[in-house]
């Protein structure tokens, strides 16, 4: 799971939950963008610019669609413990999209112990960030030999910094 989208309502402040519910039930057709939020999804600026120019990329999202996405993230977070197969969880320490608090809660839900890799310079779009080749190599290595350490050492990094307090 790369930067798992598990930002469920249980970890959202009350005002975000309230505004989402109100918007979805009164004006679900209204669209919003991420402009002005000051969030950086990746360090690969060239790729972000290309995505912004791509006519096939959704740049405005209906509030009703966001409500549905949050429903999916609620389900993902609530059922993380149901995963019975080996898992590799990849998270960028600079992820500004999915809060550490949410990822921490997801990891606590797992019944089995997934392998967790923390990429110090990684953002939310780990597979498109500038050091994406490192992440891809780790995934390929894990697929072929789940018991061996990842080549980057990301699974040996201070995971407690991910599991600790929010910054």
Show the residue positions of the predicted features:
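Short beta-strand/loop motif that positions the catalytic acidic residue
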Residues: 83, 89-91, 95
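Alpha/beta-hydrolase-fold enzymes
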Residues: 1-64
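Short alpha-helix in the alpha/beta-hydrolase fold that links the catalytic acid
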Residues: 85, 99-109
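Catalytic active-site module of serine/aspartate enzymes centered on a nucleophile-bearing elbow/loop
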Residues: 113-167
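Active-site nucleophile elbow and catalytic-triad environment of alpha/beta-hydrolase enzymes
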Residues: 61-79
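Acidic catalytic loop of the alpha/beta-hydrolase fold
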Residues: 59, 94-98, 125
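Conserved strand-to-helix beginnings and helix N-cap segments that scaffold or border functional pockets
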Residues: 12, 63, 99-103, 129-133
């Amino acid at each position: 799971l790369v930067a798992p989208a598990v930002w469920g309502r249980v970890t959202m402040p009350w005002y975000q939950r309230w505004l989402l519910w109100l918007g979805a039930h009164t004006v679900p057709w209204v669209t919003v963008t991420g402009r002005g939020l000051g969030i950086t999804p990746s360090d690969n600026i060239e790729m972000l610019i290309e995505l912004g120019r791509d006519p096939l990329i959704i740049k405005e999202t209906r509030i009703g669609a966001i409500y549905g996405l949050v429903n999916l993230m609620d389900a993902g977070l609530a059922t993380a413990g149901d995963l019975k197969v080996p898992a590799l969880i990849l998270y960028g320490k600079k992820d500004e999209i999915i809060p550490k608090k949410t990822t921490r809660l997801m990891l606590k839900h797992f019944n089995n112990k997934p392998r967790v890799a923390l990429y110090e310079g990684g953002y939310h779009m780990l597979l498109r960030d500038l050091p994406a080749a490192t992440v891809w190599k780790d995934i390929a290595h894990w697929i072929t030999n789940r018991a061996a350490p990842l080549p980057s050492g990301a699974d040996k990094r201070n995971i407690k910094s991910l599991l600790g307090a929010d910054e």
